[in-house]
Amino acid sequence: MQFSTFQKNLDNWQGASLIFGVLEEEIASQLENIKFIVDPKLLLKKVTQKKFKGEKGETLSFEFLDQKLETLIIVGLGKSKYLNKSDIENSIGNLIRKTVDKNEKISILLPWELINSQLEINQLAESARLSAYKDNRFNKKKDEKKVLKEIEFLNFKSFENICFEEAEKICEGVELARRLVAAPPNSLTPQEMSMQASQIAKDHGLEVKILEAKECEDLGMGAYLAVAKGSDLDPKFIHLTLKSEGPIKEKIAIVGKGLTFDSGGYNLKVGASQIEMMKYDMGGSAAVLGAAKALGAIKPKGLEIHFIVAACENMINGSAVHPGDVVKASNGKTIEINNTDAEGRLTLADALTYASDLKPDSIIDLATLTGAIVVALGNDVAGFWSNNDDLANDLKAASAQAGEELWRMPLQKAYKEGLKSHIADMKNTGPRAGGSITAALFLEEFFDTEIKWAHIDIAGTCWTDKNKGINPSGATGFGVKTLVQWIKNK
């Protein structure tokens, strides 16, 4: 799918479907903006008859028989003083999703004076494309409906030289993350994930290293391998490196939890634990690889970025880890496994140690780590923890720009008491209360504390059961846009 603009004489324009955004106030004057299609006075009469007021989310459609336009969809944006970028994106996204099966091209005309920067234009374009996303890979009968190929923006004023190339690259990263998360576990195995990473490296000139189980064993990754040994599928430890040409001003490591399926192990997931959905337990690694794809194409200056995923399954066989086992992570710390369904933090323990040994300036990890964060923040907001206020503020700002909401959670040191073990250095889970916090405190034990670090728990945000905003039902690709924006802001 591509983006385009039409900025010439609109009298010469024609199209199939036009989405036209209007504010709640002064509708009559705004209708003058589409006089190249229809008589504004006639349209105002019809709009008035339909009692359309331009309230947020309100829509009105008209069908035309002439050659200039087939369908006009007017969408209300509400009052200008209350309008924000997210409202515009969600309104346009909902409409695109409703019309995507009917058109190969959709045109959009908005009150551009409310868009404050080229960045916001690009983000609007991203939202439009991501709203139209469809995944029909596993359907027996291929979708015979039309496929949206182009989104066109009409009549820019302040953004005549707008370029959408970067927006397209970011969308490709989000779409990759969505495909990875949505793929069934018999399709997206650790092997397949490593192949996806290798393809990113090939396409965008990244360095790639895939560590096999023996190499991980040689590095002392006892926590990661304890999880992996319950599966008949070999684990794959993925390390991609994107290094800018010229002087490097900052080194960054981005780590993603990569459980391609999580049965819970011997603490088997039952009932409301949704074992059938545990294909998305690699949402963190999907975000990391999606960001790698986007940033590999964008090629930021002055940075060395490491993308790390410890991919494996958490399954049950004769070799699977038992509740009560003690394992040793690669930093030498011993862990009593009191719950085999808290496996993600075990894989991250060795992945974070590996990242720390690279001596980066900062480490970000993303993981579908706890159900507790979903209870705390729901499905629209991801919780994050950080040992550095500057990093936390930068991530929060980037997430706001990207339209992915983060909420900072406390690293409540007193809660570490709940991780104490009588036979090992620590347990892998604490008490039920504050479960997402103790999970973050556990991770904090596996990297050099001089390194700036943030942990983002996306358990509630990586999937949606229904259409919501710019996300069709299914995988959201949450985290890609925030990571890319954070890097771009440097």
UniProtKB/Swiss-Prot annotation:
Protein's GO biological process: proteolysis
Subcellular location, record wording: Cytoplasm
Enzyme class: hydrolase
Main localization (coarse): cytoplasm
E.C. number: 3.4.11.1, 3.4.11.10
GO terms assigned for molecular function: manganese ion binding; metalloaminopeptidase activity
Pfam family, one: Peptidase_M17_N
Cellular component terms (Gene Ontology): cytoplasm
CC cofactor: Mn(2+)
InterPro entries per UniProt: Leucine_aapep/pepB, Macro_dom-like, Peptidase_M17_C, Peptidase_M17_leu_NH2_pept, Peptidase_M17_N
Reaction it catalyzes: Release of an N-terminal amino acid, Xaa-|-Yaa-, in which Xaa is preferably Leu, but may be other amino acids including Pro although not Arg or Lys, and Yaa may be Pro. Amino acid amides and methyl esters are also readily hydrolyzed, but rates on arylamides are exceedingly low; Release of an N-terminal amino acid, preferentially leucine, but not glutamic or aspartic acids
Protein residues bound to Mn(2+) 2: K257, D262, D281, E343
PROSITE patterns: CYTOSOL_AP (PS00631)
Residue positions binding Mn(2+) 1: D262, D341, E343
Cofactor note: Binds 2 manganese ions per subunit.
UniProt superkingdom: Bacteria
Residues at the catalytic site: K269, R345
Keywords tagged on the record: Aminopeptidase, Cytoplasm, Hydrolase, Manganese, Metal-binding, Protease
Keyword Cytoplasm: yes
Main function: Presumably involved in the processing and regular turnover of intracellular proteins. Catalyzes the removal of unsubstituted N-terminal amino acids from various peptides.
HAMAP family: Cytosol_peptidase_M17 (MF_00181)
Family: Belongs to the peptidase M17 family.
Protein known as: Probable cytosol aminopeptidase
Species the sequence originates in: Prochlorococcus marinus (strain MIT 9312)
Gene (name only): pepA
